[in-house]
């Protein structure tokens, strides 16, 4: 099971206040919700968790102004199934989406559907990876291709049922799409936007402007680079994602022959 740490900014909510023998009622305002997901993002790459490799000032601000969780877990470490768990609040064997080769049954109850019923305008933008089209969203623009992982450069999107290709880098494009939704949303309604970035998921393709940003930086080797799994169970040694088993010269190291 993958250990996930997340920083959440909790919006202020107005509550009913009760006095001595009298009750003063204040209008309860429905909070706007922005759910931000990055993909395979280790805490060592976030300075708000003490990571020193790079600085992440925007994430740090969210962590400082909200609540930072230091010990929480995803119920499924796979991309699509983990997303299905977030949407449904159910374990994978209950919601039926157990691996990335499956298709999510969007007919079941999800929290965006409940928010719609409560008067929210809902949107999902970025990586979806559930194969089926979104339900419970007034607007969606989700990555397609490469088995729904999407591409880093000039990616294709399914935008409200229409396939479109956007020129540029995927992180910039997803961010611009999210900002456009916020600018053009129905201001008379509260909103919930699920904002899902593809990065930094393998195969680690940066924006062209960042290709040389670490040319003069030497990163320390992690202690587990050549791990012998001493003192741990057999499952750790037999897991698939390791340098020896899955790291490739072309896909990962970008060494062209």
Question: How would you name each of these model-derived features?
Answer:
Residues 2-9, 20-257:
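Formylglycine-dependent sulfatase
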């Amino acid at each position: 099971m993958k250990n996930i740490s997340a920083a959440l900014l909790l919006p202020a909510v107005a509550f009913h206040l009760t006095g001595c023998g009298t009750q003063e009622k204040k209008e309860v305002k429905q909070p706007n919700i922005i759910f931000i997901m990055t993909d395979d993002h280790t805490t060592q790459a976030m300075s708000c968790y003490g990571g020193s490799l790079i600085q992440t000032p925007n994430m740090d601000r969210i962590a400082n102004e909200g609540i930072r969780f230091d010990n929480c877990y995803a119920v499924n470490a796979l991309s699509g199934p983990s997303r299905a768990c977030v949407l449904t609040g159910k374990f994978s064997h209950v919601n039926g989406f157990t691996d990335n080769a499956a298709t999510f049954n969007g007919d079941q109850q999800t929290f965006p559907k409940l928010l719609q019923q409560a008067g929210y305008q809902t949107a999902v933008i970025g990586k979806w990876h559930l194969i089926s089209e979104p339900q419970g969203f007034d607007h969606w623009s989700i990555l397609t291709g490469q088995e729904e992982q999407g591409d880093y450069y000039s990616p294709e999107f399914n935008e409200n049922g229409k396939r479109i290709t956007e020129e540029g880098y995927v992180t910039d494009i997803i961010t611009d799409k999210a900002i456009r939704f916020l600018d053009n949303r129905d201001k008379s309604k509260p909103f919930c936007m699920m904002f899902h970035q593809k990065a930094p998921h393998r195969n680690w393709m940066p924006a062209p402007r960042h290709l040389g940003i670490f040319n003069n930086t030497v990163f320390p080797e992690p202690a587990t680079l050549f791990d012998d799994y001493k003192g741990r169970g057999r499952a750790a040694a037999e897991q698939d994602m390791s340098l020896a088993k899955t790291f490739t010269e072309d896909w990962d190291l970008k060494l062209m022959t």
